[in-house]
C-alpha cells in the first residue's frame, strides 16, 4: 500500500478512481482530481505548501512533485503526464502537457497548455513557456 501521511495536520485528498502504486508516497497538502495515477517510487510532497493536481494526471515512476516553502505551491492541470524521474517544483503546469523523463521544472515556472518539456531538459526559475511550445535543452 502507498505511503499516505498527514503533515501539519493536513491529509492528502484523492478524487475518484485514483491509482497509487504500493511504494508511492503522497504526503501533506495534496489534492488530486479523478483518475490520477502515481507510480512506483514517485513522491508527491505537499509538506511546505500546496500541490493541486487536476484530473487524469499521470506521475510516472521515480518522479518528484514538490513545492516551495512560503513562496510557490504546485498546480498541475488536467491530462498532464510527468515522466519517469522528472522533478516538478513550485510551478504551474497547464492542461495537456508532457513533462519528459528526467526533466526538471524549477520554481515559479509557468508551462502553457499543450506543451512538451523534452526528456532531460532543465527549465530554469521564472521561465514562462507559451502554450503549444516544445522546450528542450540544459537550460531549456
What is the meaning of each model-derived region?
Residues 27-33:
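N-terminal glycine-rich anion-binding loops that anchor highly charged ligand groups
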Amino acid at each position: 500500500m502507498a505511503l499516505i501521511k498527514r503533515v501539519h495536520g493536513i491529509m492528502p485528498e484523492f478524487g475518484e478512481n485514483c491509482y497509487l502504486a504500493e511504494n508511492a508516497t503522497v504526503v501533506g497538502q495534496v489534492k488530486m482530481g479523478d483518475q490520477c495515477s502515481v507510480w512506483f517510487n514517485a513522491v508527491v510532497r505537499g509538506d511546505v505548501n500546496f500541490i493541486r493536481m487536476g484530473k487524469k494526471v499521470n506521475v510516472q515512476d521515480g518522479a518528484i512533485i514538490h513545492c516551495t516553502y512560503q513562496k510557490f505551491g504546485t498546480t498541475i492541470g488536467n491530462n498532464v503526464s510527468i515522466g519517469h524521474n522528472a522533478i516538478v517544483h513550485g510551478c504551474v503546469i497547464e492542461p495537456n502537457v508532457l513533462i519528459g523523463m528526467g526533466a526538471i521544472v524549477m520554481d515559479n515556472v509557468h508551462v502553457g497548455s499543450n506543451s512538451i518539456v523534452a526528456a532531460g531538459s532543465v527549465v530554469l526559475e521564472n521561465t514562462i513557456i507559451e502554450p503549444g511550445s516544445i522546450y528542450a535543452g540544459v537550460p531549456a
